[in-house]
Structure formats: C-alpha cells, structure tokens
Amino acid sequence: MKTYTIRPLDNTPEALAAAVNLLSSNCPSESERYERARLVTEINSVEEQLFYKKFFAAYDLEGSLIAVGGIKAADWASDTHILYMMAVEVEHRGKGVGSGLEAARIQWMRDHFSHGRCLVSTKHKKRFERWDFKIVSEINDRYLMILEF
C-alpha cells in the first residue's frame, strides 16, 4: 500500500521552508550544487507560480513533507526542460517515492508542452533509462541524460 501522496509543492511559508530544509539536509555531498541561498531562491519561486517551472512534493499520511523535486525550462535552450533539486528523506528511500516524483514531473512536462527534451544530471543512469532517457555524456561518474518527446 502506498503511504504517500504526490502533488505540487504547497506555497505556504512553512512548506517552502520545509522543502529547503529537506533538500539541504538530504544532499550534504552536493553542498556546492545545493547551496542554501540557491535553494531558497529556487524554492521561493513557487510563490510566483511560473508556467515554466514546477516543484512537486511527496507527503506522508500525516501530511509531512518527505520528498521534493523540481522541473524547469532551460533559459538557454528552446523546448528544453531540466529535472533538478530532488531529495527524498532517508527513511522513505526505496519505497517508490523518488520514482513517483520523477513520473509526476515528466507527466507535467508532457501535459504542458507538446514537444521538446528533458535533461537530467545524475549518478543513477538506470533510474532514468526506465523513463527512456538516453546517455549524452559521462564525467566523474555523473551522467548527462536526455529524454526527447
């Protein structure tokens, strides 16, 4: 039985702060990419409800935030989106939460854009191959992957 729900990240100050805290505490090895000031800026953009950017969240049955992930249009390439800033609380990993967030973000992109591509930078290539992402390059055990639709 699924013990969580996935929906757009709430735009209350409490939800936004919880998302920043979840990302910063669950990605310590990525502190250069997930610098707290950047997290605050990116997450707080939820309040603006931009058409080209969306954050999704997973909530447990009590309504607590257990995972978050974003998708946004690349400002440097037409018809291109980027999956970014995803983290799942340690105790909820391996239960399909991350896969659910990936599915929600990919589906949102397909629902709102008729064609294009989606990029992700990841250490987990098999995770994204199941969504039909293809490897573009590999540097230092990180893969740049692309999904075209």
Give the role of each language-model region.
Residues 1-43, 55-59:
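Short amphipathic alpha-helix that is part of the acyltransferase structural core
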Residues 46-51:
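Short loop/turn motifs at secondary-structure junctions and domain boundaries
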Residues 53, 140-144:
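Short hydrophobic/aromatic beta-strand or adjacent loop that forms the aromatic wall/cage
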Residues 57, 64-73, 80-82, 87:
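Conserved beta-strand in the GNAT
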Residues 84, 93, 127-130:
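Acidic/histidine-enriched, beta-strand-rich ligand/metal-binding domains
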Residues 88, 94-107:
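Conserved acetyl-CoA-binding loop-helix of GNAT-fold acetyltransferases
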Residues 109-123:
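Conserved GNAT acetyl-CoA-binding A-motif
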Residues 122-141:
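Conserved active-site alpha-helix within GNAT-family acetyltransferase domains
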